[in-house]
Amino acid sequence: IEARKKALGKILAIHNKSCLYCMRSTSCELQNLLHEYGFTNEQELPKENLEALDTTSKVLVRDNNKCIRCKRCINICAKAQAVSAISATGEGLETVITPASPKGLAASSCVNCGQCVAVCPTGALTEIDQTEEVKKALADPDKYVVVQVAPAVRAALGEDFEFPIGVDVEGRI
């Protein structure tokens, strides 16, 4: 138990603690583990050396300040899409998770399937939230709003209903 607490303390020391504003706030594995092992707010350390967000993609945002280096995103990217758009350098707490392209996710082989977002336990990878833009468009009487379901959604939606990764559920939506 002490080894786990020590490891969690090291992860917490390098973690961006913007939990209140994080999309994973109520479903964060790191928060759950910290609570389970008795960490309190007083043990949080100040934010230092924050990395810039990777906003190069039109669909995803990557925040390495929240990354706990679990490599789930790397594994699912290689397994689900076989594109390996995300990679890692270094070992242990020195590991850095990065897009395969140094120019960011948009320049990598990423196909915007969202699998990495689904497996990220801390919100280091999130979808760009366009809810407000959609609400404005729906409320505008001068606009015709058309809904289109992207191919990635047709495949990813099936996983919520326990279909194998990549099964197209078009016609079942």
Regions found by a protein language model. Give the residues of each.
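Fe-S ferredoxin-like electron-transfer domains
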Residues: I1-N112, A118, L125-A137, Y144
